[in-house]
C-alpha cells in the first residue's frame, strides 16, 4: 500500500474545476516534483493531502487514514509536514519556542526534550546560533529554513513543499535549496511544487507534470528531461517558457 493514495478526487472553487477526477500514489521514499503551469492544481493537491482543503469527490488516504474524516486530520498533519510559500512564524515567540510549540502541544513532548530536538534541527538547517532570534531579526531565507526545521520537529514521514522558494531572491533561494538537497540525500520523502529546475534536475526522483487538473505524465526524472521532453511538444514548450 502506498503511503499517500489520491483516489479520483475532484476539487472545485465555484465554477472552476482545479482537480478533475485526479488519482496518484506516493510511496514513502524519493523526491517527487510537481510541475505545470500556474492554476493547474499543484498547490491545491498538497493542501488537499494535508486536509487544508476538502475534496468535493473522491478520497485521499494517508497511511490508510482518510482525509474526509476530520478525526484523522491531526495524525495526517503529523505524518505529512507542510512548508508553505509564505512562511508563518509566530512573531511573539523566539525561534526555539516556535519549533517546540507543536511537539509539546500535540505530541506531548517534554520541554527539555523538545528544546534539545529544536537545537538539533537548527544545526541541521545551519541556524544553530538563531535560537533566541525573533521573526523581525531573520531574513526570508532564514525564515524558510526555520519553517523546514519546524516541520521536521514532528518527525513526519513526508514533507509537502509548496513553492517554498518563490518569494525569495536568488541567494536566499540557494540557502533553502541547499537544505532540501541535504535532506533528500538523507532519504527524506518530499513532494514539492516548484519552478526551480535546478532542484528538479538535481534532486527529484520522479516528475509529475500537471495541466488542467490532470496528470499529463508521471515518469522518472531522467526520462522527463530526456525522451519525454523531446517527444512531448507541450512539455517542451513549458520548459522553454520558464527558461529550461
Which ranges hold each PLM region?
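Catalytic Walker B motif of ABC-type/P-loop ATPase nucleotide-binding domains
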Residues: 159-162
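Helix-to-loop junction immediately C-terminal to a conserved catalytic motif
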Residues: 50
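Conserved signature/switch motifs of ABC ATPase nucleotide-binding domains
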Residues: 133, 154, 186
Amino acid at each position: 500500500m502506498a503511503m499517500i493514495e489520491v483516489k479520483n478526487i475532484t476539487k472545485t472553487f465555484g465554477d472552476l474545476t482545479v482537480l478533475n477526477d485526479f488519482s496518484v500514489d506516493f510511496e514513502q521514499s524519493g523526491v517527487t516534483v510537481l510541475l505545470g503551469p500556474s492554476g493547474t492544481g499543484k498547490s491545491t493537491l498538497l493542501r488537499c493531502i494535508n486536509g487544508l482543503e476538502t475534496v468535493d469527490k473522491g478520497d485521499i488516504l494517508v497511511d490508510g487514514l482518510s482525509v474526509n474524516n476530520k478525526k484523522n486530520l491531526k495524525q495526517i498533519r503529523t505524518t505529512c509536514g507542510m512548508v508553505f510559500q509564505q512562511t508563518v512564524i509566530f512573531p511573539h515567540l523566539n525561534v526555539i519556542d516556535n519549533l517546540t510549540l507543536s511537539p509539546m502541544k500535540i505530541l506531548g513532548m517534554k520541554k527539555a526534550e523538545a528544546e534539545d530536538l529544536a537545537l538539533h534541527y537548527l544545526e541541521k538547517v545551519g541556524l544553530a546560533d538563531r535560537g533566541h532570534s525573533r521573526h523581525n531579526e531573520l531574513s526570508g531565507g532564514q525564515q524558510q529554513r526555520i519553517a523546514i526545521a519546524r516541520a521536521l520537529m514532528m518527525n513526519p514521514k513526508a514533507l509537502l513543499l509548496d513553492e517554498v522558494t518563490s518569494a525569495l531572491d536568488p541567494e536566499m533561494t540557494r540557502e533553502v535549496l541547499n537544505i532540501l538537497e541535504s535532506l533528500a540525500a538523507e532519504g527524506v520523502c518530499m513532494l514539492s511544487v516548484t519552478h526551480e529546475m535546478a532542484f528538479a534536475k538535481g534532486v527529484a526522483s520522479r516528475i509529475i507534470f500537471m495541466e488542467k487538473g490532470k496528470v499529463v505524465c508521471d515518469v522518472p526524472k531522467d526520462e522527463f528531461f530526456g525522451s519525454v521532453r523531446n517527444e512531448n511538444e507541450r512539455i517542451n514548450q513549458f520548459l522553454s517558457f520558464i527558461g529550461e
